[in-house]
Regions:
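Structural motif
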Residues: 35-44, 100, 115-122, 186, ...
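N-terminal accessory alpha/beta regions
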Residues: 44, 51-155
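Terminal end segments
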Residues: 2-8, 14-32, 37-51, 55-59, ...
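A generic structural signal for solvent-exposed, polar alpha-helical segments
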Residues: 21, 42, 46, 60, ...
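Active-site substrate-binding loop specific to GH73 endo-beta-N-acetylglucosaminidase modules
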Residues: 2-31, 77, 88-92, 102-110, ...
């Protein structure tokens, strides 16, 4: 009798677990964003081109509408054939060069936004520029700002981890948030705070002031040279300026460096939700 009851209980338990798994799958599925299955006419094609770029050029709406939504989206996300500028450029006495004269960097970029055959790349470049906000007013080097812009473009649709690693050692960002002055002798908390509050976790996320201080220690070691003719140059990591002692960040302890700092932020429980919500807000 006891054997039969145990067998029945075991069977009921397995059935209960199976139902539980089914419920979990169902609830997870219902939480996903439904795929649009409505019509894809002129209005929808125009909306897609405005959302994924900077609006349609002559002929774009007709072309995208003919492709259909699925193929049009795939073409925007997985652009092939190289990036080219379409149509006539701005009329100037001299060729448009980003580092030529004051203001040409802005005109050069706006021209790319308008004429690029890869609009989502330029849209994402602008998004990353806003996400990891810097300004030449603080950096003081048009050359470094243009290099950062090109870096955002190369990483426009790539892996966010790689982008964060590139941003963390980017010369313009190092100057903007004093990363090039952050040493074991005098830790600077600017980037350590911003990488959590603005870039990966959000204001009010689950981190402490002690985490900020420990992040600053992990991020020590970047520096640069100065030349009176050239200005800021030769940005690099110098081991002797890095704090190689043990640190505790988000409750984890280790001899963390700047790459660990990025990794720990991306592994934090608040990162995924912050990332999706912030990226979604741009569209």
């Amino acid at each position: 009798m006891e054997t039969e009851q145990l067998a029945r209980s075991h069977k009921e338990l397995r059935w209960s677990l199976r139902l539980s798994r089914k419920k979990k799958k169902t609830s997870h599925k219902s939480a996903t964003i439904p795929v649009y299955k409505g019509k894809f006419g002129q209005r929808e094609a125009e909306r897609l081109l405005w959302r994924a770029g900077f609006g349609p050029r002559p002929g774009d709406v007709k072309r995208v509408k003919k492709l259909g939504m699925k193929r049009a989206v795939h073409g925007l996300v997985s652009h092939r054939g190289g990036t080219k500028l379409i149509g006539a450029g701005p009329k100037l006495d001299d060729p448009l060069k980003p580092d030529d004269i004051w203001g040409h960097d802005h005109i050069w970029w706006l021209d790319r936004m308008v004429r690029s055959n890869n609009p989502l790349q330029e849209r994402m470049t602008l998004i990353w520029h806003d996400w990891f906000a810097t300004s030449n007013n603080g950096v003081g080097s048009q050359k470094l700002m243009i290099a950062q812009n090109e870096m955002f473009r190369r990483n426009s649709l790539g892996n966010f981890r790689n982008l964060l690693l590139n941003v963390t050692q980017d010369p313009a960002m190092l100057v903007w948030l004093s990363g090039n002055e952050n040493t074991k002798y005098s830790p600077n908390e600017n980037y350590g705070r911003e990488v959590m509050e603005l870039f990966t976790l959000g204001a009010g996320a689950r981190y402490t002031e002690e985490d900020v201080r420990e992040q600053a220690r992990a991020l020590t070691g970047f520096t640069n040279e100065w030349d009176e003719d050239v200005g800021l140059k030769d940005f690099h990591f110098e081991a002797k300026l890095h704090d190689d002692k043990s640190k505790t960040i988000f409750g984890k302890t280790g001899n963390f460096d700047w790459q660990d700092s990025c990794r720990l932020c991306l592994e934090h429980q608040d990162h995924a939700g912050f990332f999706v919500q912030k990226l979604w807000s741009y569209f």
